[in-house]
Amino acid sequence: MSINDKALSDVERIKAESQGLRGTLRESLHNPVTGALAEDDVQVIKFHGIYQQDYRDLRAERHQQKLEPLYQFMARLRLPGGVLSGAQWLALGDIARTYGNASLRITSRQSIQFHGLLKPHLRPVLQALDRALLDTVSACGDVNRNVIASSAPQISAFHAEAYGWAQKIAEHLLPQSHAYHEIWLGGQQITAPEEDLLYGSTYLPRKFKIAIAVPPHNDVDVLTQDLGFIAIHEEGRLAGFNVCVGGGLGRSHNKPDTYSRLADVCGFCAPGQVLAIAEAVLITQRDHGDRSNRSHARLKYTVDRMGLDRFMEEVQQRTGFSLAPPRPFHFETSGDRFGWLENDDGTACLTLFIPGGRVADGDIPLLSGLDALARLHHGEIRLTCNQNLLIAGISPAERPVVETVLAEYGLNRLLNLAPVRAHAMACVALPTCPLAMAEAERYLPVFLDRIEALLAEVGLEGEALTVRMTGCPNGCARPYLAEIGLVGKAPGLYDLYLGGDRTGMRLNALYREALDEEALLDALRPLLKRFAGQRWAGETFGDFVRRQDLLPPDPGLPHTGRR
């Protein structure tokens, strides 16, 4: 029996019956009785870049009042490479203030999310995005997601190449349905059947993620992707890419047959072969991925079930060529470099830390300050995969003006932070994510206060630990790569993972389960004390934990990636 001779999941039925991702969205959007969509349409709208959520802080209160949940929607941009113009940034701020919760959320995949949207506002939001030459097509759903690329290599031409390939891949793998334009933008309704030669009528078994890394920076965490391309530069030019297949971090609590996996580096391709490889890997996953069990539907499980050699044989049969042996590469960091950096073209770029990736006006008027910068600067605004923001192409004449705006709005406070805070990351979690089991974005600053105090207590003040926190085990903030990873298990309780590195090349491992804040600190204190007294020169905490063999034995999963 093949993997897909089993009974298909209900999501497969919904996709097959959706009439090219249309479903009954028109009817759902016009239904005034509820703030929600019809049940099947909740799945269909994901392919349009939108998730239905509810405001969970009010769920119990509204239930007591016999009201339906406060349904809201999250819309996510399709933004290959994470690049915006100043005018586009200003448009996003206007949309957030008019229709959302007056904030923009930078994601770990170089995109922007709007939270707090109500059903009647969805069409005006997407039309406003269209006027800004932006959209949300395929930002969610069982398709190729936002293609990410290294945001700030020191050589400007290398960034331009990586960004260019992110755009090309994104366009090449875009679904062909006209449903988005019909439903949201008033496009002509198509009654004849549509054929999508790439995706078919049921699209992919699950989401599909692609990244382009430019060594020595691995800000995209390229080995966590379904498909990764590592740029290889030789003699000052782009020679091609190492191809990485089968990464993915999401897992489920208490399901040991779900696991994190780092991608295998399978070979090297020339630039002109990139699109063919991307298409072939996607189609092979389309045809062989598990459509009966969505917990096993990602590419990493397909690769492990088929075997890497057989999987790549099929990919190469589809492309008509074989990959060359992989070429040497080296990553030095996966974090962002904050402050001013000089580019090779005479301009400068400025990287700002964005607390929790949340751009809003609070103690620091961040949204207003960035709007002011966008009005005066005509270069690019780049989003990083660490949920931060980079202003690129600042001329020597502009720099004093930019520094004046930084001081006026207090944004210069985002340039000099404790390293453990600057390199931390959290997913959104509560109160909007329906999957969250615990806090993340709202709790991380509190936990970092305690971690900073603990580091000072043991003589490690200023240590650049990587701390990542998620509200559930799906891994959106990539906690399974961190030196200290916290994964929500229940309200106030987290599984503690230790032993990742600072380059995105090694998974961490489970150390303790279901710990509250005090138990987390009690677990970390003796380890950090030991690290302070016994570390080698230049050794990181993650490397120390591994060298000292402080982690439990591997649980013996089929394949949990390179350790």
Swiss-Prot record:
Keywords: 4Fe-4S, Amino-acid biosynthesis, Cysteine biosynthesis, Heme, Iron, Iron-sulfur, Metal-binding, NADP, Oxidoreductase. Disulfide bonds: none annotated. It is an enzyme of class 1 (oxidoreductase). Its EC number is 1.8.1.2. Transmembrane segments: none annotated. Binds 1 siroheme per subunit. Siroheme binds at C476. It catalyses: hydrogen sulfide + 3 NADP(+) + 3 H2O = sulfite + 3 NADPH + 4 H(+). Its cofactor is siroheme; [4Fe-4S] cluster. [4Fe-4S] cluster binds at C427, C433, C472, C476. Pathway: Sulfur metabolism; hydrogen sulfide biosynthesis; hydrogen sulfide from sulfite (NADPH route): step 1/1. GO terms for molecular function: 4 iron, 4 sulfur cluster binding; heme binding; metal ion binding; NADP binding; sulfite reductase (ferredoxin) activity; sulfite reductase (NADPH) activity. One of its GO terms (cellular component) is sulfite reductase complex (NADPH). Belongs to the nitrite and sulfite reductase 4Fe-4S domain family. Component of the sulfite reductase complex that catalyzes the 6-electron reduction of sulfite to sulfide. This is one of several activities required for the biosynthesis of L-cysteine from sulfate. HAMAP family: CysI. NCBIfam families: PRK13504.1. Alpha(8)-beta(8). The alpha component is a flavoprotein, the beta component is a hemoprotein. This is Sulfite reductase [NADPH] hemoprotein beta-component.
